[in-house]
């Protein structure tokens, strides 16, 4: 071989070697960038996971706050209803003596038509707000509804029975505002 051929081969070999080195370097560089991207993706994935967890926590906190607010509103509405009933009860207790006076007047004397109309309107108004009278002669005696002022022994009854009503009792809805004051017949013996 001639020197020039030998030189050409060496140059080709160097070029091939340089080319191989460049290719390997580019390949390593590309692989390195893949490793870099993977390394970048991992923190990004962790960050996204953290953000998702924080978002879920915030959603949970919001749901809890909404539930707490709903419970507060319900409790407040219930408290307002209790206060309304208490206020109505107080107003009704003030009016009850007037109703009692009208009942006594009706029982012991005759009323003119205008007075009967006033009594009827007053009772109708009380019924509209939920006030009902109770306590009639012949009703079974109930200590939760009746206040016994007198007891009369009687052979005609088997159980304690209301004989006469001194003052009617009143309920506002299910709540007893005032027990009926009654005379009770009790069985002999």
Swiss-Prot record:
GO cellular component terms given for this protein: cytoplasm
InterPro entries on file: GrpE (IPR000740), GrpE_coiled_coil (IPR013805), GrpE_head (IPR009012)
Region span, Disordered: 1-54
Gene Ontology MF term list: adenyl-nucleotide exchange factor activity; protein homodimerization activity; protein-folding chaperone binding; unfolded protein binding
GO biological-process terms attached to the record: protein folding
Principal location: cytoplasm
Location(s), subcellular: Cytoplasm
Keywords: Chaperone, Cytoplasm, Stress response
Ranges of compositional bias, category Basic and acidic residues: 1-38
Role noted for this protein: Participates actively in the response to hyperosmotic and heat shock by preventing the aggregation of stress-denatured proteins, in association with DnaK and GrpE. It is the nucleotide exchange factor for DnaK and may function as a thermosensor. Unfolded proteins bind initially to DnaJ; upon interaction with the DnaJ-bound protein, DnaK hydrolyzes its bound ATP, resulting in the formation of a stable complex. GrpE releases ADP from DnaK; ATP binding to DnaK triggers the release of the substrate protein, thus completing the reaction cycle.
Subunit structure as annotated in this protein's UniProt entry: Homodimer.
UniProt record similarity statement: Belongs to the GrpE family.
HAMAP family the record matches: GrpE (MF_01151)
Name this polypeptide is given: Protein GrpE
Organism: Tropheryma whipplei (strain TW08/27)
Gene behind the chain: grpE
